[in-house]
Amino acid sequence: MLNKRDFMTAAVALAASSAAHAQTAAPDTRTPRPAIARGMMKTTRLFRSPPGYANGLAVAPEGLWIAQQKLSGDSAKRYGMPEPSDLREAAWLVDWNGKLLKTVMTNCRNCSGMAYGDGHVWMMANQSPQGCFQVDMNGNQISHRQIPLAMPGQDGGGSHGAQWRDGKLWIAALRPKLLLRVDPKTWMPEVAIAAINSPDKPRSHDLTFDANGDIWLVTGNDSRNYKEGKPGLTKYDGKTGQVIGMYDFLPGSADPHGLEFHNGTLISCDAGIHPGWPNGDSPHAGWVVKIEPA
């Protein structure tokens, strides 16, 4: 049986042994989280989109594709809009002065994002029947497929953006809150990045890649009008998926929906319609804008 003196001696020896073990233990090799850059952005008007709600962008060799958003069914009722006589939604190709070059009509509904690749536009619905509409340059629908990873018996939910990159389709998937890379032929998901939003900006919209391969995602707050709106951008490391930047916009900036990268600059469009806002509340409604550091 240990007396008090023996107990104290043993305790000191154990502590010394533990300290020595800690000094010789393998170092922590986990990759440290990168510092998150912060900053302010501003928008500058470039040109007006064709008449209608512009809610998606895609750069092409010929110019810029713009996705038309129409409000129909429950969406039209919610915004107090009449039911459109033609439910089809357009993909407009314009030059970099805003001149209309081509119009492709699609069966997308409440279109809230698009991509251009492999000679097709890929239109992302945010209303029943949901999914991605692949359409060729003659307006022929090649496919209509749901966003992957839905539960059995469910559709894939809505999307607020898409991007074509290196032969793959990236989708901003709303229901699972993921940025998904999908093989456009097999429709199998290959990569999933969590859409990280700050508590004050729970909404997410379109995504794009910059020249370094990093990912930018439009974010925003829940608000009742343009003055209350606080749009933002989240930047992800394109190799790790980790957040490396969070940016706010100067007051008076456009309300960004679509997002693209062209000639070293982020490009966006202000749809002129926003959940919870009066229609056309943004003074930049209908404008394509560039985004730059303030």
Each model region followed by its residue ranges:
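Beta-rich, blade/repeat-based domains predominating
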Residues: 51-60, 108-117, 149-165, 199-212, ...
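Blade-level signature of beta-propeller repeat domains, shared across WD40, Kelch, NHL, RCC1
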Residues: 260-294
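A short loop-to-beta-strand structural motif that recurs across blades of beta-propeller domains
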Residues: 89-92, 131-133, 178-180, 231-234, ...
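Conserved beta-strand positions in repeat-built beta-propeller and related beta-rich domains
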Residues: 50, 66-75, 83-85, 123-128, ...
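A short helix->beta-strand "capping" segment at the edge of beta-propeller domains
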Residues: 30-50
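A short beta-strand motif characteristic of beta-propeller blades
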Residues: 42-47, 99-104, 141-152, 188-197, ...
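Short loop/turn segments that connect beta-strands within beta-propeller blades
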Residues: 95-97, 136-140, 183-187, 237-241, ...
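N-terminal secretory signal peptides and thylakoid transit peptides that target proteins
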Residues: 1-14
